[in-house]
Amino acid sequence: MPTQPSRDLQTFPNPKPGRPFEIAMECPEFTCVCPMTGQPDFATIRLRYVPAERCVELKSLKLYLWSFRNEGTFHEAVTNRICDDLVAALAPRWIEVVGDFAVRGGIHTVVTARHGERPAGV
C-alpha cells in the first residue's frame, strides 16, 4: 500500500450487497490551494454513500484526499471532482460529498455534490 499522495482509489467487495446501508466518513484535514491567490484552503470533506458492489478502502481515500493539498482548485470544482472520482471507482447506489470550507474573506462556503437516487429507508 502506498504512503504518498495518490489519485488511485482502492476498493473492496461490499460485504452485504443485498442490503442497502449507508457509510459515512468525515475527513477534517482536507487542504487544497486557492487558484486565485495561491493561499491554502482548508475544509472538512464529508462523504455519505450507499454502496452497490464496492466500498472504498480508507487508507487509499486518505491518500487520495491528500493528493489535492498542492493543487490549485476552486471549492466547487474539487468537491464535484471528488464525487465524480468516487462514482467512477465505486458505482454506488447513491453518494453525497460535502466540502465544508473554512472561512475565507469573511465567507463560509459549503458545496454539496450528489449522484444517484438515495434508496428509500436508508
Swiss-Prot record:
* Tagged with keyword tRNA processing: no
Pathway recorded for this protein: tRNA modification; tRNA-queuosine biosynthesis
**Gene Ontology cellular component terms for the protein in this record:** cytoplasm
Q: Which reaction does it catalyse?
A: 7-aminomethyl-7-carbaguanine + 2 NADP(+) = 7-cyano-7-deazaguanine + 2 NADPH + 3 H(+)
Location in the cell: Cytoplasm
Q: Where, in this chain's numbering, is substrate bound?
A: V56, E57, L58, H75, E76
Oxidoreductase keyword on record: yes
Q: Which Gene3D superfamilies match?
A: 3.30.1130.10
HAMAP family referenced in this protein's UniProt entry, alphabetically: QueF_type1
State the function annotated in the UniProt record: Catalyzes the NADPH-dependent reduction of 7-cyano-7-deazaguanine (preQ0) to 7-aminomethyl-7-deazaguanine (preQ1).
Give the protein name, as stated in the record.
NADPH-dependent 7-cyano-7-deazaguanine reductase
Q: Which organism is it from?
A: Anaeromyxobacter sp. (strain K)
